[in-house]
């Protein structure tokens, strides 16, 4: 990729690149779940959705990583890969229907943010509370 160095220095991957990932169906395949055909009509041309699996996700990640830019990898699939799965697995149906298509098509971005007011032990002590919250959301 000829512009990776400039993108790294700017600390931003152009929105058009992320959009292209969505148009090619790559974003829909990077969630660690079955290919969500109900939220997008975009498909990876070489693999039908019903045959898509984690191996294919690994191939995409490996190919993006060949650029040698951690900034590009994290800019394209880092936050998306961390923030997208909880939405699609645990999010309320109305929320997924409203946000999901734009995420999968590359029109919007997502990330998972965890704040730590003090230090790391605060978060590790909070895991039970977080698990309880997720369980309540699923019921």
Question: Which role does the model predict for each range below?
Answer:
Residues 1-77, 94-98, 102-105:
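Amphipathic, small/basic residue-rich leader segments at the start of a protein or domain
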Residues 38-40, 82, 120-121:
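Short secondary-structure boundary/hinge segments and terminal tails
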Residues 60, 83-87, 113:
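Adenylate-forming
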Residues 71-81, 107-116:
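Core alpha/beta catalytic barrel or barrel-like domain that forms the active/cofactor pocket
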Residues 90-139:
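Glycine-rich, Trp-frequent "lid" loop and neighboring beta-strands that shape
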Residues 72-94, 123:
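N-terminal glycine-rich flavin-associated loop
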């Amino acid at each position: 990729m000829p512009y990776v160095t400039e993108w790294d220095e700017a600390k931003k991957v152009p929105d058009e690149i992320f959009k292209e990932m969505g148009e090619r169906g790559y974003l829909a395949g990077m969630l660690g779940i079955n290919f969500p055909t109900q939220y997008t009509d975009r498909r990876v041309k070489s693999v039908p959705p019903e045959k898509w699996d984690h191996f294919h996700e690994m191939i995409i990640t490996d190919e993006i990583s060949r650029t040698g830019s951690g900034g590009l990898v994290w800019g394209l699939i880092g936050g998306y890969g961390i923030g997208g799965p909880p939405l699609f697995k645990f999010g309320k149906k109305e929320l997924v229907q409203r946000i999901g298509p734009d995420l999968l098509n590359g029109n919007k971005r997502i990330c998972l943010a965890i704040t730590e007011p003090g230090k790391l032990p605060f978060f590790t002590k909070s895991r039970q509370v977080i698990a309880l919250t997720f369980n309540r959301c699923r019921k």
